[in-house]
Each structure stands twice: as structure tokens, then as C-alpha cells.
Amino acid sequence: MSFASEFKAFALKGNVVDLAVGVIIGAAFGKIVDSIVNDLVMPVVGAIFGGFDFKDYFVALKEIPPGVPHALDAVKKAGVPVFAYGSFLTIVLNFLILAFIIFLMVKQFNRMKRAEPAPAPAAPPEQVVLLREIRDALRR
């Protein structure tokens, strides 16, 4: 078998295609979760903790030059090293929301799998039934 045909057989297996579809859908779903966190959750958290965007919380590790606004992007542009804990907390919140949603999806999927009753066993062929009757008759 040639290298190209081996690769084609590998790449077109159902598992590889399913994995590719899952990665693509996961990336799109990640963008939805990012939007939920950045556009819906974090503004509320920011309003509770001081009125500005939570992802702009940082600690400058050097003195901020005079005239530079105290915003994360401006401080980074000025070359000041920062400890951007607000961005980190936003990403952690993204992860927790995504993990919770995936947990709910898996839980629902497992519930649906359990809800389906097991199929009744198929009746044995007539030959098997006849052989069992003969066996039982010989035992007597």
C-alpha cells in the first residue's frame, strides 16, 4: 500500500472526520462563550467592582510614565510590564462557563442514552429451538 493511499485511508476514517467536525464546532462555540463573558457577564461584574471593564484590571510592575492613561492597552503600548490579572480572570471565567455548558450537554446526552430501553433479544432460529427440544428430550 502506498503512502498516499495509507494517508487517505487514515484521513477518511470516521473518527478523524468526527474529530475535525468537533474541533470546528468547538472553536465556534468558544467564540460564543467569549462573547457571553465579555459582552454580558463581565460588564455586570465591572459595574459591581468599580464601573469599568474587569479585563482592564492590572498592576504595573514599573512606574507608569506621566501622561500615559491608566488603561491596560495604553500602559502596554508605553512598554510598561504589567500583571494583567483582570484578563486572566476573564479567561478563567470563560473556561468555567464553557466547562459548565459542556457538562450540561454531556449530562443530557447520557440521560438520553439511558432513557432508551434495551432492545428485546431476537428470537432464536427454528433450528436452535428444535435442537434445544431434542437436547431436553435426551436428558429425560
Swiss-Prot record:
Bilayer topology annotation: Multi-pass membrane protein
Molecular-function annotations in GO: mechanosensitive monoatomic ion channel activity
InterPro entries: Mechanosensitive_channel_CS (IPR019823), MS_channel (IPR001185), MSC/AndL (IPR037673), MscL_channel (IPR036019)
Localisation: Cell inner membrane
Domain of life: Bacteria
Gene Ontology CC terms: plasma membrane
Gene3D superfamilies membership: Large-conductance mechanosensitive channel, MscL, domain 1
Keywords: Cell inner membrane, Cell membrane, Ion channel, Ion transport, Membrane, Transmembrane, Transmembrane helix, Transport
Membrane spanning stretches: 9-29, 86-106
DNA-binding among keywords: no
Statement: the UniProt record of this protein carries the keyword Ribosomal protein: no
Oligomer and partners: Homopentamer.
Family of the protein in this entry: Belongs to the MscL family.
Functional summary from the UniProt entry: Channel that opens in response to stretch forces in the membrane lipid bilayer. May participate in the regulation of osmotic pressure changes within the cell.
Name the record gives this protein: Large-conductance mechanosensitive channel
Organism lineage string: Bacteria, Pseudomonadati, Myxococcota, Myxococcia, Myxococcales
